Amino acid sequence: MKYESIRPQVEQIAREAGRIILSFGEFHVEEKEGHANFVTDVDCAVQEYLAKVLSDLLPGSHFIGEEQENEQLTCAPTWVIDPVDGTTNLIHNYRQSAVSIALLEDKHPVLAAVYQPYTDELFFAMKGCGATLNGQKISASSHPFERALTCFGTSPYNAELAERSMRLALAFLQNAADIRRSGSAALDLANVACGRIDVFFEIVLKPWDFAAGALLVTEAGGRFMMPFEDGEIRFDCPRGILAANGKCAEQALALIRSI
């Protein structure tokens, strides 16, 4: 595959970014626009590191990160990253945060790495090559919808969507097996990919939250959809997303669209 040669370096970079996260004993917290929307100097340090090493790894590539939103996605090779997905978890030492790295070409993911530094779990995928966890092949689950464990995401700074998110969560609680909320979409998508959970949805997510996870899910045999719109899956602006195993996907999609 085209980017197979850089896989070892990307994996090493993801792990080093995780080590940076773990190296901070204390850190400074600032609020961004919106209620309870935080950024720390950990986010900034990891993004600065990733911007440099990924650009050096693939000269001429572009870079879009959560803490630097000003670049527009083009067809050129572009790194789309979230330096710390789960910043609020990090602040509270909840230990559910991840480094999310995706390489997009022609505006779609071709390489993905999600690293959970607290458990030393590295999820990796390349288009057409399957998905792995610490080098071992992974696949989405085969649980039917009535046995599905569902994760969902929402955020205090999208308060206008909170009520609908909770209605959807209640519907899944009443129709599937159970629900969870982890606070890290990248990890939730990775957990769909490896079969730990069966469904994940969120009404609005930024591309750096889901670009890597989308490729992990599809390469693991799951389904990745945008349930609130028709047409091509896009990674150039905020979207609502649904990820599920093949057995759950259609029922989950129908339930979301019915609420």
Residues covered by each model-derived region:
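N-terminal subdomain of lithium-sensitive/metallo-dependent phosphomonoesterases centered on the IMPase/IPPase/PAP
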Residues: 1-84, 254-257
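An extended, acidic
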Residues: 140-259
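DPxDG-like acidic metal-binding loop motif
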Residues: 73-132
